[in-house]
From Swiss-Prot:
It comes from Clostridium perfringens (strain 13 / Type A). The active site is at C2 (nucleophile). InterPro entries: CBAH (IPR047711), CBAH/NAAA_C (IPR029132), Ntn_hydrolases_N (IPR029055), Peptidase_C59 (IPR052193). This is Bile salt hydrolase/transferase. Taurine binds at N82.
Length: 329
């Protein structure tokens, strides 16, 4: 599961982030990698050297960093979301192509490119390969949302047919089916409105709304990918932007909280609870990574620009899931 979101504030800042909906912890922490840093996979000997500094949520496996979402020093953000059934990775490298292991795709994007347009150009010759980070750890079925400080966003999906790159003017991504299906599905909700429905005369009977919100009657409320896509797309569009960036930051979290999963509400066939482990929000211009967790609603912030971008080591920040309460008496 998972939901991705990108939006622009009234002052022209760009916020990008996601809900991480998963039934288990993956030992995640916030990871900072300086520019010009060489990452070497001990298992398959593949290497990657960062052109740009990277900050995001992920895990380090045998000294090699992998990311669920993050951004780089140039204001390019990327998030990987579950994409079951439809995804089809290449089984082997293709000669003449840029072959990218699945686990490395997000880091490859953030380490090498400064804009969505640069990524789109590079993807014209890319091949996403089903090479795991380790023989004991299979790849996750993923598609990716990528956004930058120009406000442009794309979705990258590798299916049986080809590697698809969609322009994302909606600013939202969830899971399967494919992104173009979700966009077409928006047409089913053309009748939704943000304003209250006026009184209606049904023959001689006057019908009056009994409460606010009648304009969005029919907005889906379940946790399926299709319903979450619709709900976030409309809430994003309805959002009233504020003169204070801090308020828009809070609005970002409120939108994603509207599709956050409560423990027990969404159970897998194995009776495990799919829940929103964390919500992230990155200010792409400022280089600040904000997040809160299922156990702790307090917003945490890590500022990339307070780190040494030319450092010589990876730095991690502990994932904060300890409940914090502001006692006022």
């Amino acid at each position: 599961m998972c939901t991705g979101l990108a939006l622009e504030t009234k002052d022209g800042l760009h916020l990008f982030g996601r809900n991480m909906d998963i039934e288990y912890s993956f030992n995640q922490s916030i990871i900072f990698i300086p520019r010009n840093f060489k990452c070497v996979n001990k298992s398959n000997k593949k290497e990657l050297t960062t052109k740009y500094a990277v900050l995001g949520m992920g895990t380090i496996f045998d000294d090699y960093p992998t990311f669920a979402d993050g951004m780089n020093e140039k204001g390019l953000g990327c998030a990987g979301l579950n994409f079951p059934v439809y995804v089809s990775y290449s089984k082997e490298d293709i000669e003449g192509k840029t072959n990218i292991p699945v686990y490395n795709f997000l880091l490859w994007v953030l380490a090498n490119f400064s804009s969505v347009e640069e990524v789109k150009e590079a993807l014209k010759n890319a091949n996403i390969v089903d090479i795991p980070i380790s023989e004991n750890i299979p790849n996750t079925t993923l598609h990716w949302m990528i956004s930058d400080i120009t406000g442009k966003s794309i979705v990258v999906e590798q299916t049986k047919e080809k590697l698809n790159v969609f322009d994302n003017n909606i600013g939202v991504l969830t899971n399967s089916p494919t992104f173009d299906w979700h966009v077409a599905n928006l047409n089913q909700y053309v009748g939704l409105r943000y304003n209250q429905v006026p009184e209606f005369k049904l023959g001689d009977q006057s019908l009056t709304a009994l409460g606010q919100g009648t304009g969005l009657v029919g907005l889906p409320g379940d946790f399926t990918p299709a319903s979450r896509f619709i709900r976030v797309a409309f809430l994003r569009d309805a959002m009233i932007k504020n003169d204070k960036d801090s308020i828009d930051l809070i609005e970002f979290f409120h939108i994603l909280n509207n599709v956050a999963m409560v423990r027990g509400s969404t159970r897998t066939v194995e009776e495990k609870s799919d829940l929103t482990q964390y919500t992230s929000c990155m200010c792409l211009e400022k280089g600040i990574y904000y997040y809160n967790t299922y156990e702790n609603n307090q917003i945490n912030a890590i500022d990339m620009n307070k780190e040494n971008l030319d450092g010589n080591e990876i730095k991690t920040y502990k994932y904060n899931k300890t409940l914090s309460i502001n006692h006022v008496n």
